[in-house]
């Protein structure tokens, strides 16, 4: 198997640069790494956008151990998130040339991607000859279709595609891919959910169009993807659906049937499950920007609640309690300080 640069991994790393910078607020760190970020984006634009329309359409190696061909929402959403992050990073480091380049590419690419891939319900892969390449998903509903949106939320840049389309896509993933039993689900590789268990499969074809050799992991249940979808659902206002997905994971890894501290994909303690941290941030509505000196909470849960939180300069407990008929917010710092940080309502 020829290992080529991973499209999702490289572009996801660009998004993480901005996420980590905002958590640290260290401009020197950003200035030091910025030239490498520019090189990574130059490679992406040259290697994966073959026709120059700011939508990826080349051979795109991914975490599914295969290459996607043609426009597809999974890698392209990460590309859009990377462009948006780079637009903001370029402004911070004073790189006006690249700031304008990335701003224009994002605006053009987002509009084109939405036009090409949104089918009125969710985002699909665009392929004229779906069976030309093995392991594609075509018109199928991929749970991972808006992985880039998940990364965008974690980086605090909001929606990268029309908000109503993002919500529709996530509702569709829950509608078509969430299973309340696995008696009739084909899983020709590994069975991570069985019998009466609940979970979300990687892909389905509710409107037909399943390729002759489809995405090989389509019938599997990956907790890392489930957490990602849960986060996107919560940010889209579908809190109940998001928590339903999370509960299904915890019910499967309950300490009786499976180890609750080792969520399995390709082996024990698989790192994709660390996407679970995003659920905490989504439920808190936490936005941390140490560069701009702001911290805000907009909880998705109404009513009284209490939760751990962490940002670049402190960690502690956020709570909201009803006092004299009014919901009041409280922040208890257990380590660090927020003295120079503006906590926004």
Where are these regions (language model features)?
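Extended glycan-interaction surfaces of carbohydrate-active proteins
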Residues: 1-4, 47-71, 111-222, 254-255
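Aromatic-rich carbohydrate-recognition surfaces in CAZymes
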Residues: 1-55, 70-90, 103, 145-152, ...
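Short, solvent-exposed positions on alpha-helices
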Residues: 27-32, 97-100, 104, 240-244
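N-terminal leader/propeptide and maturation segments of large enzyme subunits in energy/redox metabolism
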Residues: 85-102, 166, 176, 180, ...
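Alpha-helix N-cap/helix-initiation motif
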Residues: 2-6, 26-34, 68-75, 95, ...
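Glycine- and acidic
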Residues: 1-2, 18-27, 62-67, 210-215, ...
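Non-catalytic C-terminal accessory modules of carbohydrate-active enzymes
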Residues: 53, 193-198, 215, 219-220, ...
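Short amphipathic alpha-helical coiled-coil/interface segments
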Residues: 102-113, 246-249
